[in-house]
Amino acid sequence: MTAEVNLAVELPGLKLKNPVMPASGTFAFGDLPENFNWDEMGAIVLKTATRHARTGNPQPQIDLLADGVMNAVGLTNPGAEVVASEKIPALREKHPDLPILASVGGESVEDYVEVAEILAAAKPDALELNLSCPNVSEGGITFGIVPEMVEKITRLVKEKVDLPVYVKLTPNVTSIVEIAQAAEGGGADGLTLINTLLVLHLDLKTRRPVLGNDFGGLYGQAVKPVAVRMVAQVKQATSLPIIGVGGINSPEDAAEFILAGASAVQIGSMSFYDKLAIKHVIDGLPAVLAGMGTSDVTSLVGQWQSNKQ
């Protein structure tokens, strides 16, 4: 019999019964499996909303690999107004005790602020800034790779909304620590990392990319070592709580992220293969933590030890 293990975690704006939640986009705006008790999750993270509705990128948008998923969906969503007026209220009515993180996207700094204000009016528990969107006014460069832009967007959003703000970091940078510190400087309440790795997969017969948008984002088991490394580095360099994401397929994977420095975790790609992946991680986590000699999940956060010490 597994010893009693406390999985409860408190983060800014979030009281989680356990540290496990879906990554943004996994279950859209609450489209969860019917054979799963939604309230067993620590929280739900919504798909990214933009100022106006988006139909997404050309097909194909998804490429399933042996050890991961490539996607170039293009932030398909009905627009922030619909998410705020319909999606969030409907989810709140069905699951009043389930913490909600609303994901914010944009094509300009002004977009991010406006979308954040629109979503905040629907009273989710927190916002997650998806800074992996392209900055249209600057030739399409990704917002999240420029420290000054990360700091600016975070600061402006924080000035306009009375909600905790978590900044989701792109791994496609030279220094993830520099980006994390920029978010902290802008007043972020927490960090989510990592977003997808920019990749290209070519079809040898057609000599063309497999994805309709050419380049895509890779997530799944293949990116886990990168994500764990970045979580560990950011934990050592900032004081912000971290939500870790990237290739979590099992309770052991979740525990590894927590050991590296994550206070909570998100699961994305595994849910494409197993709709109950989140439930399996939640159910299996107590035994894994007990086996590590831990009776409270919070006591494990960031407790890895370097071989160099």
Regions found by a protein language model. Give the residues of each.
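Structural signal for hydrophobic packing residues in well-ordered secondary-structure cores
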Residues: R92-H95, K123, V161, L285-G293
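Short gly/pro/ser/thr-enriched loop/turn and capping motifs at secondary-structure boundaries
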Residues: R51-T55, P134-V136, L198-H201, F272-D274
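Short amphipathic alpha-helical segments
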Residues: P33-N35, N57, A116, L204-K205, ...
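N-terminal capping/small domains of soluble enzymes
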Residues: M1-I100, G106
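Hydrophobic faces of well-ordered beta-strands that scaffold small-molecule active sites
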Residues: V20-S24, G42-L46, I100-V104, L127-L129, ...
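Short, surface-exposed connector motifs at secondary-structure boundaries
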Residues: L14-K17, K94-I100, K160-V165, Q236-L240, ...
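Alpha/beta catalytic cores of nucleotide-metabolism and tRNA/nucleoside-modifying enzymes
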Residues: M1-A3, L218-S239, I243, N249-Q309
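Alpha/beta enzyme core
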Residues: E107-I243, E252-A260
